[in-house]
């Protein structure tokens, strides 16, 4: 999560808008099993950035995020993120850390929809020439499986607590996939960022990305997701490749 911090810095720091998010993922509602841990590596490469960039080469960032999540109770987990990136010139940069507790509605409640709530908080900077800002994200996760179809909606609220870009805004996300033979899921994902609640940005300065994704259910201990996202507005990154690899370890 860093869309709000970057999108609201546009006029002063246009080059900061070049890179993709460190973590591009629509969440499912279940938490990891009690006493289990999952290690996930998020790799995102921006092939083509915002059309408003003066230099197209500024967009070619590779973002790497290590996410480690442990189940501390049956319906409660805590995740920890380490954000890093390689700039267009190949320089490695450390960008920050965040922690994310999450709770989910127990299956015993027999809700018709899956639901969970997470609060992510920590410090982040867009690159190593900028200051860290304390920021976070409140993420409501609502999902549903019906037959071979899966749907998930994350109406996220992003917030920045320090620096020149203090405020809160909304970054909605959506995913749907159709599972084939319980081995492959094909569908699409959408990611948006509208700006602050107090100042919704003009349409061309908002971020809206959508694209095809694939989920591979190769083994219960592994998580594999990949997608190619396309920008729908001038200020969106125009082409972003996202890859997620996860490995679970049980008690």
Residue ranges and their predicted role:
Residues 1-22:
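Bacterial Sec-dependent N-terminal signal peptides
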Residues 18-251:
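Transmembrane beta-barrel domains of Gram-negative outer membranes and organellar outer membranes
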């Amino acid at each position: 999560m860093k869309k709000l911090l970057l999108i609201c810095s546009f006029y002063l720091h246009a080059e900061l808008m070049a890179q993709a998010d460190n973590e591009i993922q629509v969440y499912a509602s279940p938490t990891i099993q009690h006493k289990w841990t999952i290690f996930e590596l998020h790799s995102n490469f921006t092939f083509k950035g915002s059309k408003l960039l003066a230099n197209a080469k500024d967009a070619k960032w590779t973002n790497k995020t290590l996410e480690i999540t442990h189940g501390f109770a049956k319906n409660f987990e805590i995740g920890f993120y380490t954000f890093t990136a390689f700039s267009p010139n190949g320089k490695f940069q450390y960008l920050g850390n965040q922690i994310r507790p999450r709770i989910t509605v127990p299956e015993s409640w027999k809700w018709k929809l899956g639901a969970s709530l997470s609060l992510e908080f920590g410090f982040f900077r867009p690159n190593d020439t900028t200051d860290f800002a304390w920021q976070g994200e409140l993420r409501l996760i609502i999902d549903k499986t019906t037959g071979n179809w899966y749907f998930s909606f994350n109406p996220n609220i992003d917030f920045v607590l320090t620096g020149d870009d203090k405020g809160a805004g909304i970054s909605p996300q959506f995913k749907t996939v159709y599972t084939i033979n319980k081995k492959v899921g094909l569908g699409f994902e959408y990611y948006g960022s509208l700006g602050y609640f107090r100042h919704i940005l003009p349409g061309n300065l908002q971020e809206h990305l959508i694209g095809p994704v694939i989920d591979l259910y190769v083994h219960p201990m592994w998580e594999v997701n990949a997608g190619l996202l396309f920008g729908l507005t001038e200020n969106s990154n125009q082409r972003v490749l996202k890859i997620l690899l996860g490995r679970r370890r049980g008690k």
